[in-house]
Design a protein with these regions (language model features):
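Bacterial N-terminal signal peptides
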Residues: 9-17
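Blade-edge motifs of beta-propeller repeat domains
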Residues: 20-40, 72-89, 121-138, 169-186, ...
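Beta-strand-rich domains and repeat architectures in extracellular enzymes and scaffolds
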Residues: 37-55, 60-63
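Beta-propeller blade termini
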Residues: 43-52, 72, 92-101, 121, ...
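Hydrophobic beta-strand segments that make up the repeating blades of beta-propeller
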Residues: 46, 58-62, 107-110, 156-159, ...
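Glycine-aliphatic tripeptides that mark coil-to-beta-strand junctions in extracellular
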Residues: 54-56, 103-105, 152-154, 200-202, ...
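Short glycine/acidic-enriched loop and turn motifs that connect beta-strands
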Residues: 64-66, 113-115, 162-163, 209-213, ...
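Blade-level signature of beta-propeller repeat domains, shared across WD40, Kelch, NHL, RCC1
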Residues: 339-374
């Protein structure tokens, strides 16, 4: 197993200012990070309770190693040494859900180099076992799950880099059958799933990472595993990441996107009936990619934390509870080439913490909150 080592980094002793006054001196809300070794070119980090012990665990996708690093959380902010799980070529995107009905979290993984999705089943003993590989097509780049046909079994949707979305319907034993392929050009990227129009069926929202594209696509589900032709939601520009949350506390899900190339983030306010209103884009640090939403300021209002790949930082953007945000935001330097972040309460103190993977250094950093409010 990979060794665990502590790195009392100096990165968070000072909050640095970046570009054009877009950030301000940041309050000292994070403890110094603790670091864990991961594989080469860590692409994605996710936090999830994988073994039903009520403590969040961490999965890291190591794209150059053909491995996953699984860190079992101990509930006090520390983790066991990594369990290494072998994958296909160039693992790139990951989703976690129960795919075989045993109430234990499983892993669905896009192998970019193989054109496959690997289904890796979680076991009662905390280990993982490859169940099957599903051919989906050339260059799978994003994956998400939901019950698309209302049979209480998790299904999958996969985007292929240039033009398609593939739907895989779950059988219930960890295997899947290929259902439909949908045209999703140009350059479909990240997806998120929920019922966005209130009809009881799961829908898929998608961002497009093509130049000069300034809209999102929404595939409204029919409830039988098929989807209506996509509707366009105006806004964003060459977006690369998408998530959802109720940002204005009106009971309806909103969409939050980021553009790695345009250095911007966008908010789309939902009305619960499938309509979205784009709010004004807000600029930030260089290379924003994945986003975590949660209460990071202790005011019971959702905030946004963004991983800035080219900026070497994470940005904490406090929300006002009405869909607007504090500006300038707070910026924390974390190290060279942060690739992905995840948020969870890793030590059980009721405060959201952050996990960050650094691409070149091959490490996972855990930033624990040390104060509940700004």
């Amino acid at each position: 197993m990979m060794s665990f080592y502590k790195s009392f980094s100096i990165f968070l002793t000072t909050a640095l200012l970046f570009g054009c006054g877009s950030s301000q001196p940041a309050p000292d809300i994070f403890a110094l990070p603790v670091s864990y070794a991961v594989g080469k070119k860590p692409e994605v980090v996710i936090a999830h309770d994988m073994n039903n012990d009520e403590f969040p665990d961490i999965v890291v996708v190591n794209s150059a190693d053909r491995t996953l690093s699984y860190f079992e959380g101990l509930g006090d902010g520390t983790f066991k040494d990594a369990q290494i799980i072998e994958t296909g070529r160039e693992p790139f995107a990951v989703e976690v859900a129960d795919f075989n009905g045993d109430y234990i979290a499983d892993i669905a993984l896009c192998n970019y180099g193989d054109g496959e999705v690997s289904i890796i089943l979680g076991q009662k003993d905390g280990l993982f076992k490859l169940k099957t590989n599903v051919k989906v097509g050339r260059l799978p780049i994003s994956i998400t799950s939901g019950d698309f046909n209302n049979d209480e079994i998790n299904d999958l949707a996969v985007t292929l880099r240039f033009n398609k979305m593939i739907v895989l319907l779950g059988v219930g034993d960890g295997t899947f059958k290929l259902a439909e392929a949908y045209q999703a050009a140009p350059t479909p990227a990240h997806m998120t799933v929920s019922d966005y129009n209130g009809d009881g069926n799961q829908d898929i929202a998608m961002v497009l990472n093509a130049m000069k594209v300034r809209y999102l696509k929404m595939f409204y589900g029919n409830g039988d595993g098929t989807f209506a032709p996509p509707q366009l939601i105006g806004g964003g520009s060459q977006s690369s990441f998408l998530t959802h949350h109720d940002m204005n506390l009106d009971g309806n899900l909103d969409l939050v996107s980021s553009s790695l190339m345009k250095d911007s983030r966008s908010i789309f306010m939902g009305n619960g009936k499938g309509d979205f209103t784009k709010m004004q884009d807000f600029a930030g640090e260089k290379g924003p990619h994945n986003i975590v939403v949660g209460d990071f300021t202790g005011d019971k209002v959702p905030d946004i934390v963004v991983c800035n790949r080219r900026g070497g930082s994470i940005s904490v953007i406090p929300g006002n509870g009405d869909g607007s945000f504090v500006y300038p935001h707070y910026n924390y330097v974390v190290g060279s080439q942060p690739r992905s972040i995840a948020g969870a309460d890793f030590n059980g103190d009721g405060m959201m913490d952050i996990a960050v993977v650094l691409y070149q250094k091959k490490i996972l950093e855990i930033f624990l909150r040390k104060t509940s409010a700004l």
